[in-house]
């Protein structure tokens, strides 16, 4: 009874609205991220105790556990109460996962939420609109596990709207290169043209890089080669600055950069949170030249391979 009352307090404080799905419920026991649907487990790049992040597609997943309210007499009512409790816990875990996500190499999303009441209110509002993934899992002891997901772009848009968030500040609108060869409109012919690339693939294995919403690529002198100010706002808000995967071949064939990505090796990570990547000065010079003539950096067509 105390647990149900506690979950009720979560509802009153955060204002969550429960979502309900019963059809096709599972009865297999599980725990933690092991309760995530198989599709989420297959796609996630980073796992945590109560959820995971799919950094390739920009999705947060969180699981929630709920127990039935024993004061209800019917099994249907007890199942319903357990599901509602599980949904609230999943939303709370999702909020915690979002808060602890790196914003850049120095700050987290929670830092941004502390900086602005507006950011905090909007992100919590987005949490209330999250979707359940798959059907609830009913355990053998009557408890329930559910999975909720949230699109990363919803968080990025909220943060980017606030001028106080330096990680998403840009001095000017990004202009298309004069000699632009558009990877998004030129079709398959661009993938075979000499010197024309469809994206950037950075091998960051061994660098201890940590994924972030607004990372940078630096050269050995500390100059920014790629950052939020170098990307068209439409692309950065919709798909983020970079995608991250552990499988090199999966990263190479990812829709974001596939066909003919320019491949480089990162030297090491940088910053307090190890979210920035350092590349050689020679690669930096070549990328800057490409950025003047091609569109893949402006369109955030960047993938990073992790350990």
Functional labels for PLM-detected ranges:
Residues 1-4:
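Positively charged n-region of N-terminal signal peptides that target proteins for export
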Residues 6-7, 21:
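Intrinsically disordered and other compositionally biased segments
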Residues 8-15:
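Bacterial N-terminal signal peptides
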Residues 18-307:
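Domain-level marker for long, solvent-exposed, non-transmembrane regions
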């Amino acid at each position: 009874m105390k647990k149900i009352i506690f979950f009720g307090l979560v509802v009153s404080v955060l204002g969550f609205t429960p979502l309900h799905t019963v059809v096709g419920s599972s009865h297999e026991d599980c725990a933690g991220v092991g309760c995530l649907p198989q599709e989420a487990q297959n796609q996630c790049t980073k796992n945590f105790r109560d959820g995971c992040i799919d950094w390739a597609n920009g999705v947060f997943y969180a699981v929630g556990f709920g127990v039935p309210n024993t004061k209800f007499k019917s099994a249907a009512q007890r199942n319903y109460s357990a599901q509602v409790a599980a949904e609230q816990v999943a939303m709370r875990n999702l909020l915690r996962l979002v808060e602890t996500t790196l914003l850049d190499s120095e700050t987290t999303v929670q830092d941004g939420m502390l900086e602005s009441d507006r950011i905090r209110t909007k992100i919590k509002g987005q949490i209330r609109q999250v979707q359940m993934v798959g059907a609830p899992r009913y355990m053998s002891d009557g408890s329930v596990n559910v999975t909720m997901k949230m699109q990363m772009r919803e968080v990025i848009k909220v943060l980017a709207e606030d001028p106080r968030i330096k990680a998403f500040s840009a001095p000017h609108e990004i202009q298309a290169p004069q000699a632009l060869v558009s990877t998004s409109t030129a079709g398959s012919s661009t993938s075979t043209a000499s010197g024309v690339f469809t994206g950037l693939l950075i091998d960051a294995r061994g660098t201890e890089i940590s994924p972030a919403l607004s990372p940078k690529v630096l050269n050995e002198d500390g100059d920014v080669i790629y950052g939020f100010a170098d990307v068209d706002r439409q692309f950065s808000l919709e798909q983020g600055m970079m995608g991250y995967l552990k499988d090199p071949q999966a990263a190479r064939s990812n829709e974001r950069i596939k066909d003919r990505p320019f491949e480089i090796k990162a030297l090491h990570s940088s910053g307090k949170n190890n979210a920035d990547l350092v590349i050689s000065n020679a690669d930096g010079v070549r990328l800057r030249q490409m950025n003047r003539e091609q569109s893949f950096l402006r369109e955030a067509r960047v993938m990073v391979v992790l350990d």
